[in-house]
């Protein structure tokens, strides 16, 4: 006599998603918490066999239940953005104007600002909560060494030889650690008119939902050839540098030391990062319509396909381009939302706050 009993538990999946958006004058916080619980099949089979000799055999096999839970703090696709700013010249003023209108990196999910030295109070002034204060930033204790001279051996740029400053910025960003919770890390030049929402849409096909998944990848954004000696068909231009979290993971875990063994002293920081990513085996993804850059291929600020436009070194020119790219209604809607968010904060904390004007200029 053979008796078989089989019990099968079916798969159960429960997903709960909560989205909360909070904006303040200094930061924009978008929180998405998605908890997914997957319970897989559990099967228990008992077989009993009885023979005429009265011998009996019982076999029991059990597959235990497995529960997998995945939680995201930030929305998909999330951006951690940063800028490195020189404390003299136009950049602090330009950054203050961006901060007021919550433009560029200040509209990313999280952001950081680094400077090449401590800034005086007058250079970083912005109105916030009714007080004149300075933008929070992290000073870097190294100096830019000057402009590159292409006539010298090993020099690859006639722009600032700023690699040492950015090496320190990357070290501080990794030490800060907040970028680990985001899908992409984005370095933005202060004079780039940058739209984070456009970049998020652009990156969706390249982004895995799970934070532990996804390829190590960076975006090359310029295909211009600079003379017969130029052998690089695709380049990383520094106005907008986009890296997946796992690309920076490769850099953070031994990659930085390997890359700093290259002969980089005559390089700009964008060329260094491209050579570094290639050395570490990070995948290139080409998007030559991502930026409109006068140093590569210029584009009209009305071009809706572009994620960023470069370069605009004064606030008037910067926000003229920003307004053209947003369109009159888009710009007014954005500024109205900024004013509403700051009024809501004022009501919560009882502070008087200077709000951005209705004009985008």
Please state what every model-predicted region is:
Residues 261-361:
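C-terminal catalytic/acceptor-binding lobe
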Residues 1-72:
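Extracellular mucin-like PTS domains
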Residues 81-83, 113, 187:
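Structural beta-sheet core signal
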Residues 71-94:
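N-proximal low-complexity "stem/linker" segments adjacent to membrane-targeting elements
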Residues 81-84, 135-142, 234-243:
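Conserved, well-structured core segments
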Residues 97-108:
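Short, acidic, metal-binding catalytic loop of nucleotide-sugar glycosyltransferases
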Residues 112-183:
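Active-site-proximal specificity loops/subdomain of glycosyltransferases
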Residues 156-163, 167-297, 336, 344:
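Conserved catalytic core of nucleotide-sugar-dependent glycosyltransferases
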């Amino acid at each position: 006599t053979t008796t078989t009993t089989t019990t099968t538990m079916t798969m159960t999946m429960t997903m709960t998603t909560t989205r909360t958006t909070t904006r303040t004058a200094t930061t924009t916080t978008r929180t998405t918490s998605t908890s997914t619980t997957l319970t897989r099949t559990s099967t228990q089979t008992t077989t009993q066999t009885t023979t005429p000799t009265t011998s009996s055999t019982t076999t029991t096999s059990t597959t235990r239940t497995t529960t997998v839970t995945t939680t995201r703090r930030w929305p998909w696709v999330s951006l951690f953005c940063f800028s490195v700013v020189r404390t003299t010249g136009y950049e602090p003023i330009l950054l203050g104007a961006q901060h007021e209108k919550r433009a560029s990196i200040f509209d990313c999910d999280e952001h950081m600002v680094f400077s090449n030295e401590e800034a005086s109070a007058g250079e970083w002034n912005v109105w916030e909560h009714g007080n004149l204060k300075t933008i929070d930033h992290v000073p870097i204790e190294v100096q830019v060494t000057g402009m590159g001279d292409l006539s010298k051996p090993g020099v690859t740029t006639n722009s600032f030889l700023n690699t040492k400053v950015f090496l320190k910025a990357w070290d501080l960003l990794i030490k800060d650690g907040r970028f680990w919770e985001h899908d992409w890390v984005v370095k933005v030049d202060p004079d780039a008119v940058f739209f984070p929402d456009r970049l998020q849409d652009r990156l969706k096909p390249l982004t895995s939902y799970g934070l532990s998944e996804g390829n190590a990848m960076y975006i090359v954004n310029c295909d211009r050839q600079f003379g017969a000696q130029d052998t690089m068909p695709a380049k990383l231009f520094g106005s907008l540098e986009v890296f997946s979290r796992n690309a920076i993971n490769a850099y953070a875990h031994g990659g930085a030391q390997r890359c700093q063994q290259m002969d980089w002293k005559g390089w700009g920081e964008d060329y260094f990062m491209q050579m570094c990513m290639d050395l570490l085996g990070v995948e290139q993804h080409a998007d030559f319509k991502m930026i409109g850059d006068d140093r590569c291929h210029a584009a009209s600020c009305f071009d809706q396909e572009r994620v960023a436009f470069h370069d605009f070194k004064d606030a008037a020119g910067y926000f003229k381009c920003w307004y053209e790219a947003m369109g009159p209604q888009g710009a007014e809607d954005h500024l109205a939302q900024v004013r509403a968010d700051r009024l809501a904060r004022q009501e919560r904390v009882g502070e008087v706050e200077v709000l951005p004007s209705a004009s985008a200029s």
